[in-house]
Amino acid sequence: MNKSKQNIENGFSKISSHYEQLDKTSSLINWMRKRVRKHLYKELKPAAKILEINCGSGIDAVYFAKKGYNIHATDIAPGMIDFVTSKIKSESLKKNLSCQRLSFNELNKLNPQKYNHIFSNFGGLNCSSEEELQEVFGLFKQLLSPNGKITLVLMPKICIWEFLKIFKGNKTAFRRLKKDGVFANIEGEQVHTFYHSAKSTKKLLLKDFKNFKVENICFLAPTGNHVDFPEKYPVLFNTLSLFDKISNKISFFRGYGDYYILTASVK
């Protein structure tokens, strides 16, 4: 295993408990997650068979399994998969939820079967360069049933909230624009992170996919690391989240923010 993959494994295993805690305590993270789920609900078939890549500690996998969907959740980090395994047992979800420790660029190792939907939330695929993404996307079509769909949540290059850091003298304000990505410190592990515009992601998918839909998350609302912002500034947060809603009615703004959601159908 190369050093980059090892860092991803170690870093996200170490931070798995923190992610679990955030889901229980951060209203901002829950607001963001609800945005993704609302989008996804519109695209899912009843009782759909879903492949989740970069599932983390299984927060979304458990949620959708409880709603009657069939999920196979994968992640490279053993600490994350340990959480999913524990939840399958404690929540009696064996019928609807299975999990596997697997990197997103090893999807060819999955047992041969077809899925109605492939899902990846909150920037898991941002650990891939554009070249690596192209390889991953090349595996999607063979995993999907006819009329299957993908929904990917990625971090773009343009994030107004981060750009505003420049007024505080923060040198990371424009880190997303770096061509070769940046190294994020995940619990002491240096994880190479790349930012992908919605336009470039669509271009990589055009060979096998059509009917693209893009929606932003946190166009003007605070980025996900401002976990207590809604409690500290409730009126401002409600105003900014309203602008987020409005911005998604204007096609030009849909690929910008802390994240964007991209859904497409297989050709």
Question: What do these predicted regions represent?
Answer:
Residues 109-118:
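A short acidic, Gly/Pro-enriched loop at the edge of an enzyme's catalytic core
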Residues 57-107:
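Class I SAM-dependent methyltransferase SAM/SAH-binding core
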